[in-house]
Regions:
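S-adenosylmethionine
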Residues: 1-176
Length: 176
C-alpha cells in the first residue's frame, strides 16, 4: 500500500522500495515527505542579526544566523548587493565561532572556499589568509569577499603542504 504512494510523494518507485526494505513503512514515508519540503536558506549576517531577521523575513537561530523558508533569487533579497549577509548553513558557521574572539588576530582558513567561514572571521575583526586548492573555488571566494567588503590574503595552495611565512594566532580547517 505504501509503495503505491511513492509517485504521489515524488519519490522514484525503485528508491521508495529500497528505503521500504531498509527502514520500514513509517520511516520511508517520513523520508519521502521530507524530500518534498522546501529547503530552508541559512544566512550569516555581518552585523545586526535581529534587524536583518525582520528585513529578510527570517528566523533568528541560536547560532546568530538567520533561516528563511521562502523562495526566490537570493540576489534579489535586501542587503545582498551591499554585502550585509552571505549564504551559510547554520552548522557550517559553528567552526569559526569555536575560535572565540578573533578581533585583531591573524587566522588562516584552510580549504576556505567558498568563503563563509573566512567572511565570519573577517566580520569579527580577524586578519584572514584563505587557502584553497581549487583555483575556480578560490576565484569564487575572492568574488564573495569583495561583495561583502572584506579583505584577505588569498592563497592558491594545498592545505596538506602549504606553510605560512609567519606564525599566526589560529588555523581553521573544516576540510571537505
Amino acid at each position: 500500500a505504501a509503495a503505491q504512494d511513492a509517485p504521489t510523494l515524488n519519490t522514484p518507485g525503485w528508491l521508495y522500495r529500497s528505503w521500504l526494505a531498509a527502514y520500514g513503512e513509517e520511516t520511508t514515508r517520513a523520508i519521502s515527505l521530507a524530500h518534498g519540503e522546501r529547503a530552508a536558506l541559512d544566512l550569516t549576517v555581518a552585523s545586526d542579526p535581529v534587524g536583518w531577521s525582520a528585513k529578510l523575513d527570517a528566523r533568528l537561530l541560536p547560532t546568530g544566523g538567520l533561516r528563511r523558508v521562502t523562495s526566490g533569487p537570493i540576489t534579489a533579497l535586501p542587503g545582498y548587493d551591499a554585502g550585509a549577509w552571505w549564504v551559510q548553513d547554520a552548522a557550517a558557521s559553528l567552526p569559526a565561532r569555536l575560535l572565540g574572539d578573533v578581533a585583531g588576530k591573524s587566522v588562516i582558513d584552510m580549504c576556505a572556499a567558498p568563503g563563509g567561514k573566512a567572511a565570519q572571521l573577517a566580520a569579527a575583526g580577524a586578519t584572514i589568509t584563505a587557502v584553497d586548492l581549487s583555483e575556480r573555488r578560490m576565484e569564487r571566494l575572492v568574488s564573495n569577499m569583495g561583495r561583502l567588503g572584506f579583505t584577505m590574503e588569498a592563497v592558491h595552495g594545498d592545505a596538506a603542504s602549504w606553510r605560512p611565512a609567519e606564525l599566526v594566532d589560529a588555523v581553521l580547517l573544516d576540510a571537505p
